[in-house]
Amino acid sequence: EAKIIARRLSDWIKSDESTADYMKTLTHDDRQPGLSFGVISFYKAQVFAVYKALQKYGITERAQDGTWQICQEYRFLDNGEERLRIGTVDAFQGMEFDIVFLSMVRSQDMNALPPHIRNEEDDKKKQQKLFGHLMSENRLCVSMTRQKKVLAIVGDGVFANTQIAEDAVPALKNFYDLCHEKGVIL
């Protein structure tokens, strides 16, 4: 997921004319070069993976103290607003960006569940092991409402389209169905 997000974000944030046309189609907005971007994950390890993947494109770098940071040219828009933020759901509370990538992280071949999940008799515990933070309605709400124009969820569509997903995280399944119905699943 991190590499997919990095490639798309790099294309969009460094847009040429063909990408600008594509972004205009997505956002219905002519002011594409001034778009802001957010990358949200439920897990800090995935945030670091996204930073690392974006380093290849010159969008992120390591600071002198070893922490990750966004390269200067991608930090702010001309009007001073934040251009790019990468972080966990909690870092996005109260924030909005034109385009948000939501990295779901969770994936599982439902036919090959590990024994500790497959043998779990309590449905709620099984769901928690499979979906983790996705089951937090507050976090899911924050993660799926930070975009002004485009929400691009990156994850395992098959996993999101299972009965256990529908039972555990109905909002995610409903969103998947909406995207499928509107023809915007990539």
Regions found by a protein language model. Give the residues of each.
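Short mixed-charge
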Residues: 18-29, 58-83
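Amphipathic alpha-helical transducer elements in NTP-driven molecular machines
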Residues: 2-6, 47, 86, 133-144
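Conserved motor-coupling elements within RecA-like helicase/translocase cores
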Residues: 66-100, 107, 121
